[in-house]
Amino acid sequence: MWLAAAVPSLARRLLLLGPPPPPLLLLLSRSSRRRRRLHSLGLAAMPEKRPFERLPAEVSPINYSLCLKPDLLDFTFEGKLEAAAQVRQATNQIVMNCADIDIITASYAPEGDEEIHATGFNYQNEDEKVTLSFPSTLQTGTGTLKIDFVGELNDKMKGFYRSRYTTPAGEVRYAAVTQFEATDARRAFPCWDEPAIKATFDISLVVPKDRVALSNMNVIDRKPYPDDENLVEVKFARTPVMSTYLVAFVVGEYDFVETRSKDGVCVRVYTPVGKAEQGKFALEVAAKTLPFYKDYFNVPYPLPKIDLIAIADFAAGAMENWGLVTYRETALLIDPKNSCSSSRQWVALVVGHELAHQWFGNLVTMEWWTHLWLNEGFASWIEYLCVDHCFPEYDIWTQFVSADYTRAQELDALDNSHPIEVSVGHPSEVDEIFDAISYSKGASVIRMLHDYIGDKDFKKGMNMYLTKFQQKNAATEDLWESLESASGKPIAAVMNTWTKQMGFPLIYVEAEQVEDDRVLKLSQKKFCASGPYGGEDCPQWMVPITISTSEDPNQAKLKILMDKPEMSVVLKNVKPDQWVKLNLGTVGFYRTQYSSAMLESLLPGIRDLSLPPVDRLGLQNDLFSLARAGIISTVEVLKVMEAFVNEPNYTVWSDLSCNLGILSTLLSHTDFYEEIQEFVKDVFSPIGERLGWDPKPGEGHLDALLRGLVLGKLGKAGHKATLEEARRRFKEHVEGKQILSADLRSPVYLTVLKHGDGATLDIMLKLHKQADMQEEKNRIERVLGATLSPELIQKVLTFALSEEVRPQDTVSVIGGVAGGSKHGRKAAWKFIKDNWEELHNRYQGGFLISRLIKLSVEGFAVDKMAGEVKAFFESHPAPSAERTIQQCCENILLNAAWLKRDADSIHQYLLQRKTSPPSV
């Protein structure tokens, strides 16, 4: 047990933040030097935007009547499109989106007039468009556009593609499935593939009679196909007015479980054959979620059914197609015996996210991809609200701070970040903005806005917005207008500072006791990962600030809107011995830098747990980020981390673990990596001893998550007792004597692999091959990179591209190798360069290529590696990953600067701890 009186005041040893920060000129010059390095490598600015024009407005669709006939053996499909169209301006051509499709014939028949056959199809492959030319002018009015076409069921996990699966009998077969967001409906049928060009859809599928056929709407007819007795034609009801990216169809073999929500919507979860039981948890979540959203928005779900389906090969986590939501198997299926607690939580969040889109995105759709964040930021916020409603025991809002809020701040502090509202055009640019800014920063600023407005007015404003724009398109300004009308607050003025400029502020705060009151002096400056902002015109934010005190740590004593660079506020009746903290609940999207006296007063609240968990987390994370930026010393943050010895909260430990992982990766470039592992063992051993290996009576979801986290951290660091017990339990698991609980498998697998040999890896690969559940395969794939032997690392990398690993999971295997060790990082980067053509062809410019690059290179910490990465991608372009590459190179330079700045002092501190360890 650690007592406050056992050591000198921790904050006095810190010399952490003041008196005020180091001389400004020194910091500015340091920051300027970093920025000059970025410029010298050409990393300071994104490449020029590619030329792009949206579709002309002369012709637009009213209704698509679409029939598709996929061939699941030859991997082709035939299509017939009859589109009711409106000619708004006389023209002799129709421009549509079209990619990887061959048009056979096309014609246009004005209403009540003769058919006009197109005389030419001009494909603009770079722009993914086709121009249909006609011999005479199409006059204004309505008519029918007919197109016959053929395409390939590709293996790129986009458009209309094939998904490989194995039947219970062991036979390999293929399903035909879709993934259209953002710009891939054009790979399934010629269309006006922009979110604002909405229409209704009548969809028919011609499929083998023993296959399941699904689309957005319910089946209204199923009849034999006249040309082949083995086929049937399945017709679906007409959809509401909707965008092309939300259209979906699936053809394959599936079982399902079903129920009805309390408001009468038919809910089904489709699973691989024989695994219907694994769909029950998601079914339960979906059946609770639909009524929750209906009540929250006060707008009913507009379709008669909602299907959730698990797809074997799937690039994203899930996709919100209206009425037919597609998922990775690991984001939907839960095995009561073999799924871990984190998987159940993940499924609940993903289901909550995708069903929120049925209103926010599907019923009301962004006008253009600039406003993507309206879809994704909102869904990424309200998924937590939904899960908190369904599973209050998850303490999910604390987890939000670690999973989304801090992740967004990490990215948004870079020079190569982007505003939430970002101008995009070419499809490759659209793919780039599916990132932590659109999702996690979007969610974080909505959370801040919700807190600023209050739940009652927020719900009122949401109802106004959804009602006004249902079946239409909207822009960010439309949402602000509705919320402003509901709340009477200056929403647009406040939020424009958060969505139209990138970055966020660092709030510096000092306090002075004046009789019975506390006077706070606040100032804001842009927070930069490279150090204090050195530009002349520093951006400003309108910052909703909440202030709490130790008198009532869970309630705001004062709420203000900071609308200027500096201001002072007075807290009435605050005693000299009471602490004051900014950002109650870590809700405001900013970082806080306290004067040394204020920080000293807060640290006992970490030790005695009087600070709420989410505030303990936020305080630690702010300090760590200030250290990464060179504003404070990393050593002082390590000292603060030691104050968490009594910490009971899973999410606080998770954030600590993440930050120590970042530091461990940095120090893997030094010769004292083992010393930081000793520090990790010292910090995590007490909580590990308290938890033990086996659940205790009365424990719940968060205890299970914490146990797995702590044992994994100790095992990876080489904690002797943990390693021995992991090996014992692994041996019994492999021999079938005592099967590991699902919550212990990841930490045990990680531990034995990290400290194992070739035989251990062979056993793990055998377990992978035998696993019937994708969750178990993924669990193994994610830890394979922990192996340390160069020969075994190469074996894992080769395995990553084998047929044993699903295409979307190759990324996590290679990324795991890069994150596993210094040698693994070098080997993974070489492997990517050597196999670039295959990898790039596999992912075809989707967001998985960005994730692969990010996971593989951003852990480097040598300046020259930034130049090497940049040079490679200049000669091997990855258009959809340009921003990611810039960000990775920037992070490499930042890591190098951090290492040069703090490595010696960290080493000295760790050595000092060996000779005189802290009394904890």
UniProtKB/Swiss-Prot annotation:
Motif Nuclear localization signal, residue range(s) on this chain: 727-731
Keyword Disulfide bond: no
Alphabetic keyword roster: Aminopeptidase, Cytoplasm, Hydrolase, Metal-binding, Metalloprotease, Nitration, Nucleus, Protease, Zinc
Co-factor binding comment: Binds 1 zinc ion per subunit.
Record flagged with keyword Metal-binding: yes
Job description of the protein: Aminopeptidase with broad substrate specificity for several peptides. Involved in proteolytic events essential for cell growth and viability. May act as regulator of neuropeptide activity. Plays a role in the antigen-processing pathway for MHC class I molecules. Involved in the N-terminal trimming of cytotoxic T-cell epitope precursors. Digests the poly-Q peptides found in many cellular proteins.
Protein name per its UniProtKB record: Puromycin-sensitive aminopeptidase
Name of the encoding gene: Npepps
